[in-house]
Regions:
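Interaction interfaces in information-processing and related assembly proteins
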Residues: 2-188
Length: 188
């Protein structure tokens, strides 16, 4: 388990809340521990980033677990984020390294006929599980679909990865923008 680099929250006067998460160290460490090739490393890093963003959206130091059933050769991807500082995760069947990372490959491997289960843990309540069927798209668009359907909050998620020529992660960061109830939809 690795401590996240940084998470920042912003709230505009127009009623738009933004949470930015940088999980570069956690993504690098996961790539190293699990000996992941580029495609698997980027996908796991993005799922770790999604878990971090979702966990910081909750109150009372809640934790969140993602169970991402890909229906691809990757199998299931697991990620947890808790205490506002920690993330961990793994891929059931990492790819063999012959496929270089591209956004099109990411979408193919994470979303086709897949399902995302999100479990929220709270000190005050019983765990709550919700799920969404995944449409075609990358990791971030699948998380956006989950939030928009499950939380019914107008949201947009972006998660980006930067790798070197050998496929090692250089940077892994993302954000969620959400329209607050008093926010102006025209500005979102």
């Amino acid at each position: 388990m690795s401590e996240m680099n940084r998470i920042d929250h912003y709230l505009s006067t127009d009623g738009i809340r933004i949470t930015v998460a940088d999980v570069t160290d956690a993504a690098r460490r996961a790539q190293e521990i699990h000996h992941l090739p580029s495609l698997s490393a980027v996908i796991l890093g993005k799922v770790l980033n999604a878990a971090a963003i979702l966990a910081m959206d909750f109150k009372n130091h809640e934790g969140v677990s993602l169970k991402w059933v890909t229906n691809s050769p990757l199998g299931t991807i697991h990620a947890d984020a808790y205490e506002g500082r920690y993330v961990r995760g793994f891929i059931e069947n990492p790819d063999d390294g012959t496929i270089p990372y591209t956004p099109a490959e990411e979408a193919k491997w994470v979303s086709q006929r897949g399902k995302l289960f999100v479990t929220r843990y709270s000190l005050l309540k019983m765990p709550y599980v919700s799920a969404v069927d995944l449409a075609d798209g990358d990791t971030a668009s699948c998380v956006s679909d989950y939030i928009n359907s499950s939380d019914q909050t107008l949201s947009h998620v972006e998660i980006e990865a930067l790798t070197d020529k050998e496929g090692k992660i250089i940077r892994m960061a993302g954000f969620i923008a959400q329209l607050m109830p008093e926010g102006d939809k025209k500005l979102f």
